[in-house]
């Protein structure tokens, strides 16, 4: 086995590395720069402790997650299913409810809310791969958001969105566009 193959195996088994790469654009390596990223960037800290708590249910991870949640207003349920390569851009007041499914390479930005409703469209959202959810955007209900979708800031989405789309406004309007996330979702894993 070559060195490159062994690094790929480590990368595939350690989901924290994907989040690190998405948020920094750099391959994780043990060193001072990586440690500075981990300690300085609360989005990386939250992603790390969130993954750790989901995997181990440890008390230490729960305490760290609770502290970061309270300090930065990050309310992401441990019962949500989040794929690899989560990107928390300007991570303040982000809410992801119980039962939500996020695919790989999803960008969540300040003030976005993703959750269930208990009336007409009962259930939680299922969001595909390579999705950008802008500032103060809201996605609610038993909806399916396709892959390669950009949800613009301040949009309210409570309906299904097909692949390769841009969603704008409140009420939301869907525009079909190939490569909708080009330039928005970077460093994909």
Region locations from a protein language model:
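Terminal amphipathic alpha-helical/low-complexity segments used for targeting or macromolecular assembly
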Residues: 1-72, 181-189
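Left-handed beta-helix
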Residues: 72, 77-78, 83-84, 89-98, ...
């Amino acid at each position: 086995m070559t060195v490159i193959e062994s690094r790929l195996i480590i990368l595939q088994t350690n989901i924290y590395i994907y989040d690190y790469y998405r948020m920094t654009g750099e391959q994780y390596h043990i060193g001072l720069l990586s440690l500075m990223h981990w300690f300085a960037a609360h989005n990386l800290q939250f992603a790390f402790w969130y993954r750790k708590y989901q995997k181990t249910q440890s008390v230490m991870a729960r305490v760290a997650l609770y502290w970061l949640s309270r300090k930065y207003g990050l309310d992401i349920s441990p019962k949500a299913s989040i794929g690899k390569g989560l990107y928390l851009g300007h991570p303040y007041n982000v809410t992801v409810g119980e039962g939500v499914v996020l695919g790989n390479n999803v960008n969540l930005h300040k003030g976005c809310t993703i959750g269930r409703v208990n009336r007409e469209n009962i259930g939680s959202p299922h969001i595909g791969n390579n999705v950008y959810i802008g500032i103060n955007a809201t996605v609610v209900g038993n909806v399916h958001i396709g892959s390669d979708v950009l949800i613009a800031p301040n949009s309210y989405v409570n309906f299904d969105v097909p692949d390769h789309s841009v969603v704008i406004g409140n009420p939301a309007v869907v525009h079909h566009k190939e490569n909708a996330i080009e330039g928005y979702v970077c460093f994909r894993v």
